[in-house]
């Protein structure tokens, strides 16, 4: 069974992306999931990571054939949304909530026509107040919340598996502080990646194991 992870830097985590290579799984939650399932079920799963740092939903859609459909996965995992907000603050190149929803829906519609038996796991984007988010915190949080709502809506609309993460990070931050889990409010620490992996594995077990 082939499992494909796609997303932005949170998924990329330093993977080998040269010339479209999918050899490296990266150093984040995808690697932790790979390690656990490979240990528990030797030889059963193949893992591919095509996450690219800086990606927004429009970038994911733009490379849908080469980095997704052509790989013909059995399970597709998508975590996207924070750059659609973040890029507006620094580069004025964000993706509005309305466009985010439209492109997300188009991606799912087109994918399910192309790969009708595909199992899809949608991960909720998340954010905490820390160094990268504090300056525009209220707007940042409001806009990420809109993308979170879209992802949940898409999961409901297409009857797909949804992994809730924002509330898990908020609860965790009450114990040890935001930057213990998300170093800058966006990018997970090792503990943050483990939190994502744990929640992903719970969802995966419900639909596959």
Where are these regions (language model features)?
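Alpha-helical cap/lid subdomain in secreted, periplasmic
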Residues: 31-43, 59-209
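Serine-esterase "nucleophile elbow" of acetyl-processing enzymes
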Residues: 1-53, 58, 63-72
């Amino acid at each position: 069974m082939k499992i494909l992870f796609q997303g932005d830097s949170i998924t990329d985590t330093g993977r080998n992306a040269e010339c479209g290579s999918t050899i490296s799984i990266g150093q984040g939650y995808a690697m932790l999931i790979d390690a656990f399932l490979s240990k528990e079920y030797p030889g059963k799963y193949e893992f591919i990571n095509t996450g690219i740092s800086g990606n927004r939903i429009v970038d994911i859609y733009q490379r849908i054939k080469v980095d997704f459909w052509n790989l013909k996965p059995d399970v597709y995992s998508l975590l996207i949304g924070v750059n659609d907000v973040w890029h507006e603050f620094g580069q004025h190149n964000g993706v509005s909530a309305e466009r985010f929803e439209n492109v997300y829906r188009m991606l799912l519609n087109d994918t399910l026509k192309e790969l009708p038996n595909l199992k899809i796991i949608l991960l909720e984007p998340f954010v905490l107040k820390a160094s990268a988010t504090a300056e525009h915190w209220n707007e940042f949080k409001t806009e990420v919340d809109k993308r979170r709502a879209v992802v949940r809506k898409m999961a409901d609309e297409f009857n797909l598996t949804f992994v809730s993460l924002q509330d898990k990070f908020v609860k965790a931050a009450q114990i040890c502080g935001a930057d213990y889990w998300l170093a800058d409010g966006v990018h997970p620490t090792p503990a943050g990646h483990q939190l994502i992996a744990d929640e992903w594995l719970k969802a995966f077990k419900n639909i596959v194991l």
